[in-house]
Amino acid sequence: MNAPAPSSARRTKKLPPLRVGIGGPVGSGKTTLLEMLCKAMRDRYDLVAITNDIYTKEDQRLLTVAGALPEERIMGVETGGCPHTAIREDASINLEAVDRMLSRFPDADIVFIESGGDNLAATFSPELSDLTIYVIDVAGGEKIPRKGGPGITKSDLLVINKTDLAPLVGANLDVMASDTKKMRGERPYVMTNLKALEGVADVIAFIEKKGLLTV
């Protein structure tokens, strides 16, 4: 991992909960990442999660069935339109969802907000998210990092998922890493195989350090 430098500050209960936005194309592994983060962090932090789908609450259902968090701590939002609108241009539906969840769980440390699947131009409004994690997958081809777009170049952390599929799709992980560094500069990235939990600890370490959750 191209990791961020540790912070000497620490988030306390006097500060609002950390809001972590998770975006990326359909099928890249956003929901899987959210599930793994919740399961790994729920014993140390008070967590709630909000998922976005266009016409259903399928991701909410998947997280509930997987036991990521208690059902009442997962809220599904039906955006009814273009996914990026609900997290950027008009984030009101998600801001309202955050307010509702925090009214139920005022001691929450982290609010995870998963966007609906979208293209490389999707970004979170700073009103909605303090940290943004953007997930792409190797199956999309090794060229994805060099295509750019705000998700690739501006997210706080880029996750390159499904590294185990690289031999099957002819993707060179070294090329993807090199292109990622060219496109992102000093911004960190992590390569993951979420199904095998590979790289999850690096994502958690990033959230804790960048989100001022640890010394």
From Swiss-Prot:
<dbReference type="GO" id="GO:0016151">
    <property type="term" value="F:nickel cation binding"/>
</dbReference>
<comment type="subunit">
    <text>Homodimer. UreD, UreF and UreG form a complex that acts as a GTP-hydrolysis-dependent molecular chaperone, activating the urease apoprotein by helping to assemble the nickel containing metallocenter of UreC. The UreE protein probably delivers the nickel.</text>
</comment>
<dbReference type="InterPro" id="IPR027417">
    <property type="entry name" value="P-loop_NTPase"/>
</dbReference>
<keyword id="KW-0963">Cytoplasm</keyword>
<dbReference type="GO" id="GO:0005525">
    <property type="term" value="F:GTP binding"/>
</dbReference>
<dbReference type="GO" id="GO:0003924">
    <property type="term" value="F:GTPase activity"/>
</dbReference>
<keyword id="KW-0547">Nucleotide-binding</keyword>
<protein>
    <recommendedName>
        <fullName>Urease accessory protein UreG</fullName>
    </recommendedName>
</protein>
<dbReference type="GO" id="GO:0005737">
    <property type="term" value="C:cytoplasm"/>
</dbReference>
<keyword id="KW-0342">GTP-binding</keyword>
<dbReference type="InterPro" id="IPR004400">
    <property type="entry name" value="UreG"/>
</dbReference>
<feature type="binding site">
    <location>
        <begin position="24"/>
        <end position="31"/>
    </location>
    <ligand>
        <name>GTP</name>
    </ligand>
</feature>
<feature type="region of interest" description="Disordered">
    <location>
        <begin position="1"/>
        <end position="21"/>
    </location>
</feature>
<dbReference type="GO" id="GO:0043419">
    <property type="term" value="P:urea catabolic process"/>
</dbReference>
<dbReference type="InterPro" id="IPR003495">
    <property type="entry name" value="CobW/HypB/UreG_nucleotide-bd"/>
</dbReference>
<keyword id="KW-0996">Nickel insertion</keyword>
<keyword id="KW-0143">Chaperone</keyword>
<dbReference type="Pfam" id="PF02492">
    <property type="entry name" value="cobW"/>
</dbReference>
<comment type="function">
    <text>Facilitates the functional incorporation of the urease nickel metallocenter. This process requires GTP hydrolysis, probably effectuated by UreG.</text>
</comment>
<comment type="similarity">
    <text>Belongs to the SIMIBI class G3E GTPase family. UreG subfamily.</text>
</comment>
